[in-house]
């Protein structure tokens, strides 16, 4: 008799087995390992072979039509499976008492037990309405995707984190939603300076969208990407009006994960990736060519040559033998360098990250605990970034009518003081004739004719050291009381704290002309080194009370209502100081310096109060209506202009639900047209601009420098809210069992009374112009998104794409731009000249604000 022998696994296999067993044990799963190797001897366990049988069947849809390409597999053993043929039929050899799992895109999965002597099956799948029943997060609640009347995009961010490394959430949003523009202004590791715009720039002030994390305002930089489950982008006034004054530029809603009530899971993920420039511009790294071009440039403007020809010839000669040495024994590639500074500055960096989470629960409680660590080396020296994240989401249900919980997260980010902007500035001042670094010293321009302003970027970056530390803590305590089946009360309290600390100090470094060993720029003595300290702290709290009502009358009339009240307060505090003259170069603490060079500090605060509400009505999931309002008050305005009212109306018609569309339901799953109108506000200005404020300065009195106060800005107590009026028309289509989805929107929004400072005559001196409600901006555009999901050979796949077009125009500012020809008899060449009023009617430098022109148009 042939027997199956228990045998030892190789060491590597045992390691995998033990670690996997531990993970499965913690997650509450059971598993087994078997071996089919058979031997003739040894202490043995009898192997009883499983009986197998061939089963056949046909898979049909809800209308009785065969389904081609449906997956049929044995539950628990995905290696035993087949797909249905052109007639929807299948044949499969399976073990006795097996369970078949049948699946197909657009239909609910189904399980069929193989028992007794049955070998033939007629299987009918039910349509999956998940796409239409999908719940989308909206302001202060959720709605079925099919019932949305506004312009809302939803991103499954959990899927994004599985497919690619994500260092910052904001940069990862690029390309995921039509109408959302994400542009990075820096490649600094961990720096969340990605500019987000929803449907263009709606104002000349802060045009960033409102960020809401689990119902409370927050920062995308403070959240672990692995904790995010879903992100919703609210784009039109109907969707945003519930947030009133804070939502004129759109809203990004972030929902984090929660634990499952029926199991405990322990998850770990780690990733190592490498970061490097994908493409760099070609630089002038041949110094002889550079010198010739500079001489040609000087000749073109009528000045003498900059470089003597003998140095050009010398560089070309020495470059032929880079490994040779000069008379001082220095290699030619160092004494006569041809440096490519882009390659020296921008190198590759490694990123490694680790994520650990524990989640689970029961019928009384559910929880998620997570932690994340990342080390991003950056591609420029001294730009290392190390963020740490922790989170606790806990929800308890002590009774059927009461829910209590907390959503708490914290983060710390440690960064070195290296800066891309400084590196790029120094790069523009560098030349190929300087060798970067050798024998502990930084190189100096080797050619005597080189300009004195020529830099060694590495030397400039190395002269400062220090750190930057960002700490964030955010906690929300929430409760929900169900008075009746249809009526509930939510109370939320949020506390947010942010602390930023930076310390920087000078580091001794020197430059050497390597060709002859002369130290040109010596080590800075400790008495000339400086140390500085910066500290910024702010805290805020939010109180919210929400009443929710929902009821369905006569099975066709679905009514829901929301009424809420909110208070918000925020306080800022900053202090900065710098000292000079270190006692010793190794002692860089603030107390070790001898001379105070600067000190400054400030504190500010502001507060808001709001009442808001929403009413939804749906008739038979066919005719949909929604109305929102928000009444906001802000301390940033005078008491006579403090409050603003912001309403919205929207409606939708699901044409696919009409009886006359009955014949299209085999291929048309959803056809909905939408329309919305709304008004939003904006108060993103300074905290005290309606009041006269004083600033400090230094002034000379009696041959001495004295501190003084002066009026820094002209007050304007008539400031009012900016207001943005938006109109949106949209259509949503789902076809072919929800495999194909199409969504299109056409919109226009106009912002009136934009709060901006005009240019004022120099007679006002250093005074800042008063902010006024003086500008108008309009945006109009089109958005289109397409999606396809299907199954091929048991493999699910999806393809998504989107297109956006937006035009932003300045309708009113400070007068129109005029350009006229003025005759000038003294101008013998042309007889006149062009004159314009650009300095009087515009502001903004290289991207001027000019009435009648586009926003952010380069001059």
PLM region spans:
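Short, acidic, small-residue-rich periplasmic hinge/interaction motif at the N-terminus
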Residues: 33-77, 99-108, 119-161, 199, ...
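Short, acidic Ser/Thr/Gly-rich low-complexity loop/linker segments typical of extracellular
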Residues: 78-89
């Amino acid at each position: 008799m042939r027997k199956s022998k228990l045998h030892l696994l190789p060491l590597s296999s045992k390691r995998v087995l033990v670690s996997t067993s531990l993970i499965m044990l913690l997650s509450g799963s059971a598993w087994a390992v078997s071996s089919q190797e058979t031997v003739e001897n040894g202490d043995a366990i009898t192997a009883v072979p499983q009986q197998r049988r061939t089963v056949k069947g046909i898979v049909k849809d809800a209308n009785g039509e065969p389904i081609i390409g449906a997956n049929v597999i044995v539950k628990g053993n995905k290696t035993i499976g087949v797909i249905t043929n052109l007639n929807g039929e299948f044949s499969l050899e399976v073990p006795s008492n097996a369970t078949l799992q049948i699946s197909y895109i657009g239909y609910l999965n189904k399980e069929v037990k193989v028992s007794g002597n049955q070998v033939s099956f007629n299987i009918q799948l039910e349509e999956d309405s998940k796409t239409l029943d999908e719940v989308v997060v909206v302001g202060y609640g959720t709605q079925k995707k099919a019932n949305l009347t506004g312009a809302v995009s939803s991103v499954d961010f959990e899927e994004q984190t599985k497919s690619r490394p994500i260092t910052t959430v904001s940069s990862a949003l690029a390309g995921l939603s039509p109408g959302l523009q994400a542009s990075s202004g820096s490649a600094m590791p961990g720096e969340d300076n990605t500019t987000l715009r929803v449907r263009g720039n709606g104002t000349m002030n802060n045009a960033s969208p409102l960020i809401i994390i689990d119902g409370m305002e927050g920062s995308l930089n403070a959240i672990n990407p692995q904790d995010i489950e879903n992100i919703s982008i609210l784009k039109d006034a109907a969707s945003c009006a519930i947030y009133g004054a804070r939502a004129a530029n759109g809203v990004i809603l972030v929902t984090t994960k929660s634990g499952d009530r029926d199991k405990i899971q322990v998850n770990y993920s780690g990733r190592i990736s490498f970061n490097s420039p994908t493409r760099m511009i070609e630089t002038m790294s041949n110094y002889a060519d550079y010198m010739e071009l500079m001489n040609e440039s000087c000749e073109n403007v009528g000045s003498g040559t900059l470089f003597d020809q003998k140095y050009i010839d010398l560089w070309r000669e020495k470059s032929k033998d880079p490994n040779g040495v000069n008379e001082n024994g220095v290699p030619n590639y160092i004494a006569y360098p041809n440096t490519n500074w882009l390659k020296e500055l921008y190198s590759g960096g490694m990123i490694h990250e680790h994520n650990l989470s524990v989640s689970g629960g029961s019928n009384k409680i559910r929880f998620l605990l997570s932690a994340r660590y990342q080390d991003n080396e950056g591609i420029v020296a001294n730009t290392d970034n190390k963020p740490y994240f922790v989170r606790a989401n806990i929800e308890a249900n002590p009774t059927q009518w009461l829910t209590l919980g907390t959503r708490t997260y914290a983060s710390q980010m440690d960064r070195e003081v290296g800066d891309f902007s400084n590196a790029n500035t120094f790069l523009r001042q560098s030349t190929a004739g300087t060798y970067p670094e050798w024998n502990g010293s930084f190189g100096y321009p080797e050619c005597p004719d080189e300009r004195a302003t020529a830099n060694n970027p590495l030397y400039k970056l190395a002269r400062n050291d220090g750190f930057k530390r960002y700490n964030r803590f955010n906690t929300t305590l929430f409760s929900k009381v169900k008075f009746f089946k249809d009526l509930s009360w939510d109370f939320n309290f949020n506390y947010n704290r942010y602390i930023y600390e930076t310390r920087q100090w000078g580091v001794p470094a020197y430059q050497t002309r390597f060709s002859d060993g002369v130290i040109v720029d010596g080590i800075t003595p400790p008495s000339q080194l400086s140390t500085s300290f910066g500290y910024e702290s702010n805290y805020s709290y939010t109180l919210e009370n929400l009443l929710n009502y929902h009821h369905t009358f006569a099975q066709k009339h679905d009514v829901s209502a929301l009424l809420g009240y909110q208070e918000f307060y925020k306080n800022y505090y900053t202090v900065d100081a710098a000292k000079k003259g270190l006692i010793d170069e190794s002692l860089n603490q603030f107390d070790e310096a001898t001379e105070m060079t600067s000190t400054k500090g400030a504190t500010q605060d502001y507060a808001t109060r709001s009442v808001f509400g929403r009413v939804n009505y749906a008739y038979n999931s066919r005719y949909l209506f929604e109305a929102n309002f928000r009444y906001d008050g802000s301390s940033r305005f005078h008491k006579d202009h403090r409050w603003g009212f912001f309403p919205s109306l929207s409606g939708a018609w699901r044409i696919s639900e009409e009886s006359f569309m009955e014949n299209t339901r085999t291929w048309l799953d959803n056809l909905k047209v939408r329309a919305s109108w709304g008004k939003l506000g904006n108060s993103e200005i300074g905290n005290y601009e309606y009041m006269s404020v004083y600033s400090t300065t230094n002034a000379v009195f009696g041959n001495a420098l004295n501190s003084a106060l002066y009026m820094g800005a002209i007050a304007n107590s008539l400031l009012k809210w900016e207001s943005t009026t938006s109109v949106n028309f949209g259509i949503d289509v789902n076809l072919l069992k929800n495999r194909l989805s199409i969504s299109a929107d056409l919109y226009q929004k106009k912002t009136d009374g934009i709060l901006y400072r005009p240019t004022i005559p120099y007679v006002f001196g250093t005074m800042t112009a008063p902010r006024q409600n003086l500008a108008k901006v309009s945006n109009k555009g089109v958005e289109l998104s397409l999606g396809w999901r299907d199954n091929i050979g048991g493999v699910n796949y999806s393809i998504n794409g989107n297109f956006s077009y937006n035009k932003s125009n300045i309708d009113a500012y400070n007068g129109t731009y005029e350009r006229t020809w003025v005759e000038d008899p003294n101008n013998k060449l042309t007889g006149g000249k062009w004159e314009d009023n650009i300095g009087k009617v515009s502001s903004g430098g290289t991207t001027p604000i000019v009435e009648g022109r586009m926003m952010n148009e380069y001059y």
